């Protein structure tokens, strides 16, 4: 075979006089890396690349410069060191040619290995997984670091930006084992079986010293993942990197040279569906190695630099072709699916649970500014067009403030899975109350969004391993209207709505009204809940202590279940005490019947009293434990934000406010307002009306709707992942990936492994529901048999007709089961209504004869007649 002939050319020290000893192809990568225990090893194609080229008979050897010269058999004795009499000129020439050919082969092989390593480290498609992990140091303390797993190496960075390299772990000498732990999360250990160092000497950029962190062990590392599912995914990925790294192609396009076989797209499992990451790495920043250093290392021997120009030209030409083919694949319409890069919000500011954060004392300097502003106002005036001073501004946009209601979105996930309508309403009510206890320090007002301003973020649900995406846009400036859309299709809920901000001035107080409705939809049940918002009331502007409260009545209504919740946010009375601040009362009703009553404080404890039992219990409290359970919010990486995204748009104003420079904040704010006026003038001059990018106005309902709204229920057999790109929510489905991607079976099918040139999975890629039975925890864990993922790919090459029939039959069976389930739920709902009506009718006492006014009237007439007759008879 070609590979065997190539090995004979490379490892023999003389022309092939006899059949050389057979070389095991599996040992070729090891032979290439002799003496490189502490250096980064090249990624070898593996043994299954031997069959890519056409096979060749063993007795036929390819012509080489050494084998082209025919040498008599007697002269081959020169190859034996003891036969010194074989020194003919022909023999010397043959030996020189053979040595030259061997050096050429050695140099080419070393260049090939070096180039292959360089391609593997710089090609982002070979990244298996990237996520944050906690690593235990030598001092038994834990630190959170960013880990990037590539075939054969594990790179550790300080932050997701891949700027501060900590170290590189060489996986070819490591063993992997799961480690029990009493703490939360999932532990595993990478260690050297002979207690030797597992670290590489240099970093990917040639660094010799890593970033300063706590000292890490030299012969092992103990990792901790956030959850068991994350840890299992890391185990799968590490086992693949440890045992099957030779099977990982660098890239389909780089491997499929002209005339070679085996370069089909489904032949390279080059990437994995990793866990949802808190941030992803820009492709150009993954491994910016110095190519010249690698080339110099390939020609480290002085004798190897002979004829290097021709080889370099050939290498550059091949590299150019490789890069062109790679870019063509990425730019093609059917290329990899890329999502937005999200980074975890490091700090979150929470106000105090009492009323101290709602009270503020205005300084004398700011009071003078307030008086200048108040002279221009009249009672009842709308403040939407009034420019407020920067010291009353909260350093974030109103679009970002509207996202405060989704830090406890896991309550909506539980509500979507709840079967009882009354319990669903209570969970929705708990979620609604969870959005109010986060208060800014002092009385602050968020920025008025610029027309066309957008804001994107998302939350990771560790329990369900899903994401909640939040997208908002300012769709109107006069009046100011903010539209938003929230989606978590995997957990089965979506929310949309628009808020019109209005403000009224009343002399010593003002009110900020949030006019509008939000619509919560449970996708699997086709239920819609309509919600309204309270208003913010600020008093003590002219005299007294400046205080901010919430007031007004709020309704949460589900028309399908005939359930309704009313909440009354009460303002503090004029002579009230501190116990009267932030009071709330409410009730849950089914039609006209009151099921439960609520009392308490919206920023503290709320109690519920069930009318059926009469007992009172704690309904909601923002305790320390609840505050620790807040979901982590991830925002878009600043480099990927557009010019009109909130964080990037207001970054200079925010920085100035946090630094206390009110003058600079006012200047930066004026620049943004003037730019907005300039854009408005340009639209007027061009006679082209401005149109929102992500939302549109429904002409029938006059409601703002998300352009890319998807209210279809999540299908675990069809849907793989939900991700966001440029404000557009996409759902990755198996039909869209067929013909381009195949799947590898894994113990946890939430983490799929597409085998095309798939890049590192972005933070916005949401993991899918399960399509396999193994370790499945999806909504229908036992609804599909133990089939491989390829059986579910329509148009795939591997499934047999029987498997396709099985898949089709399972889909039909699932649809039938779902329809039966819906019918049962509808029947159960009707029966419950009839039963409750019957019970109420049975409990109601039968009306007595004397309770009828007509009976009393007839009785009076009868008594009157009786008295009259008795009088006459006497």
From Swiss-Prot:
Segments passing through the bilayer: 855-873
Biased composition regions of type Basic and acidic residues, renumbered to the chain: 299-308, 660-684, 754-764
Presence of the UniProt keyword Membrane in the record: yes
Membrane topology designation: Single-pass membrane protein
Positions bound to a 1,2-diacyl-sn-glycero-3-phospho-L-serine: 383-388, 448, 503
Origin: domain of life: Eukaryota
Major place of residence: endoplasmic reticulum
UniProt GO molecular function: cholesterol binding; phosphatidylinositol-4-phosphate binding; phosphatidylserine binding; phosphatidylserine transfer activity
One annotated Gene Ontology cellular component of this protein: endoplasmic reticulum-plasma membrane contact site
Gene Ontology biological-process entries: phospholipid transport
Region (Disordered): 1-71, 255-277, 299-338, 660-685, 739-798
Modified residues (Phosphoserine): 12, 746, 749
SMART domains (UniProt xref): PH (SM00233)
Alphabetic keyword roster: Coiled coil, Endoplasmic reticulum, Lipid transport, Lipid-binding, Membrane, Phosphoprotein, Transmembrane, Transmembrane helix, Transport
Domain PH: 126-243
Protein family per UniProt: Belongs to the OSBP family.
Reported function: Lipid transporter involved in lipid countertransport between the endoplasmic reticulum and the plasma membrane: specifically exchanges phosphatidylserine with phosphatidylinositol 4-phosphate (PI4P), delivering phosphatidylserine to the plasma membrane in exchange for PI4P, which is degraded by the SAC1/SACM1L phosphatase in the endoplasmic reticulum. Binds phosphatidylserine and PI4P in a mutually exclusive manner. May cooperate with NPC1 to mediate the exit of cholesterol from endosomes/lysosomes. Binds 25-hydroxycholesterol and cholesterol.
Additional notes on this entry: Imprinted gene expressed from the maternal allele in blastocysts.
Name used for this protein in its record: Oxysterol-binding protein-related protein 5
């Amino acid at each position: 075979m070609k590979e065997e002939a190539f090995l004979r050319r490379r490892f023999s020290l003389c022309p092939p006089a006899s059949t050389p000893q057979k070389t095991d192809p599996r040992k070729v990568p090891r032979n290439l890396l002799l003496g490189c225990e502490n250096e980064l090893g090249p990624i070898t194609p593996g043994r299954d690349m031997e069959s890519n080229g056409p096979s060749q008979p063993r007795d036929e050897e390819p012509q080489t410069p050494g084998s082209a010269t025919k040498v008599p058999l007697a002269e081959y004795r020169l190859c034996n060191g003891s036969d010194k009499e074989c020194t003919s000129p022909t023999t010397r020439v043959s030996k020189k040619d053979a040595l030259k050919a061997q050096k050429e082969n050695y140099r080419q092989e070393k260049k090939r290995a070096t180039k292959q390593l360089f391609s593997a480290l710089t090609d982002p498609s070979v990244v298996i997984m990237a996520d944050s992990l906690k690593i235990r140091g030598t001092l038994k303390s834990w630190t959170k670091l960013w880990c990037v797993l590539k075939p054969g190496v594990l790179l550790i960075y300080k932050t997701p930006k891949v700027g501060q390299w900590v170290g590189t772990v060489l996986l070819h000498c490591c063993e992997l084992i799961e480690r029990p732990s009493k703490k939360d999360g999932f532990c595993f250990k990478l260690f050297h079986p002979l207690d030797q160092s597992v670290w590489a000497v240099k970093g990917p950029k040639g660094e010799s010293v890593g970033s300063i962190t706590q000292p890490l062990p030299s012969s092992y590392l103990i990792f901790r993942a956030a959850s068991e599912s994350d840890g299992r995914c890391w185990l799968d990925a590490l086992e693949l990197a440890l045992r099957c790294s030779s099977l990982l192609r660098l890239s389909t396009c780089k491997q499929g040279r002209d005339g070679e076989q085996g370069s089909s797209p489904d032949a390279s499992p080059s990437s994995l569906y990793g866990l949802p990451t808190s941030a992803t790495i820009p492709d150009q920043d993954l491994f910016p190695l110095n190519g010249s250093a690698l080339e110099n290392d390939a020609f480290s021997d002085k004798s190897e630099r002979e004829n290097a120009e021709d080889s370099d030209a050939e290498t550059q030409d091949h590299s150019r072709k490789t890069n062109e083919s790679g870019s063509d694949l990425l730019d093609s319409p059917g290329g990899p699916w890329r999502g937005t890069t999200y980074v975890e919000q490091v700090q979150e500011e929470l106000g105090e649970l009492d009323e101290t954060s709602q009270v503020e004392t205005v300084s004398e300097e700011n009071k003078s500014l307030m008086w200048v502003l108040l002279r221009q106002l009249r009672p009842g005036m709308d403040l939407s067009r009034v420019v407020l001073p920067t010291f009353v501004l909260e350093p974030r946009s109103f679009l970002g403030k509207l996202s405060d209601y989704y830090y406890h979105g896991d309550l909506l996930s539980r509500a979507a899975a709840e079967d009882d309508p009354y319990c669903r309403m209570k969970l929705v009510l708990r979620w609604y109350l969870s959005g109010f206890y986060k208060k800014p320090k002092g009385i602050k007002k968020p920025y008025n969004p610029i027309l066309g301003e957008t804001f994107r973020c998302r939350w990771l649900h560790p329990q369900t391993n899903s994401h909640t995406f939040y997208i908002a846009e300012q769709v109107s400036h006069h009046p100011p209207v903010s539209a938003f859309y929230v989606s978590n299709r995997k957990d089965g809920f979506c929310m949309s709505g628009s808020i019109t901000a209005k403000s009224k001035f009343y002399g010593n107080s003002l009110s900020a009204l949030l006019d509008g409705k939000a619509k919560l939809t449970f996708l699997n049940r086709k239920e819609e809940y309509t919600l309204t918002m309270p208003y913010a009331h600020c008093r003590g502007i002219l005299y007294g202590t400046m205080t901010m409260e919430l007031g007004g009545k709020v309704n949460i209504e589900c028309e399908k279940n005939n359930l309704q919740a009313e909440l009354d946010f009460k303002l503090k009375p004029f002579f009230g005490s501190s116990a009267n601040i932030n009071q709330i009362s409410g009730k849950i009703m089914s039609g006209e019947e009151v099921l439960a009553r609520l009392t308490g404080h919206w920023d503290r404890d709320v109690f519920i009293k069930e009318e059926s039992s009469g007992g009172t219990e704690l309904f909601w409290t923002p305790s320390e434990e609840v505050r620790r359970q807040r979901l982590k919010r991830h925002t878009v990486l600043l480099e990927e934000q557009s010019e009109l995204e909130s964080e990037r748009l207001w970054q200079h104003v925010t920085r100035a406010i946090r630094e206390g420079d009110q003058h600079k904040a006012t200047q930066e704010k004026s620049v943004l307002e003037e730019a907005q006026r300039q854009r408005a003038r340009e639209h007027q001059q061009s006679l082209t009306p401005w149109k929102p990018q992500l939302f549109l106005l429904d002409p029938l309902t006059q409601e703002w709707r998300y352009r890319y709204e998807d209210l279809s229920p999540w299908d675990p057999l069809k849907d793989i992942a939900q991700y966001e790109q440029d404000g557009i929510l996409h759902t990755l489905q198996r039909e869209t990936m067929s013909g381009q991607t195949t799947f590898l079976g894994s113990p946890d099918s939430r983490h799929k492994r597409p085998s095309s040139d798939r890049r590192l999975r972005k933070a916005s890629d949401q993991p899918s529901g399960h399509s396999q039975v193994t370790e499945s925890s999806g909504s229908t864990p036992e609804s599909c048999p133990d089939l491989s993922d390829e059986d579910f790919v329509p148009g795939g090459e591997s499934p047999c007709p029987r498997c396709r029939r099985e898949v089709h039959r399972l889909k039909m069976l699932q649809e039938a089961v779902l329809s039966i389930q819906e019918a049962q739920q509808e029947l159960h709902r009707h029966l419950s209504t009839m039963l409750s009506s019957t019970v109420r009718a049975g409990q109601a006492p039968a009306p007595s004869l004397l309770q009828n006014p007509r009976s009393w009237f007839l009785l009076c007439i009868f008594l009157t007649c009786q008295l009259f007759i008795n009088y006459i008879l006497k």
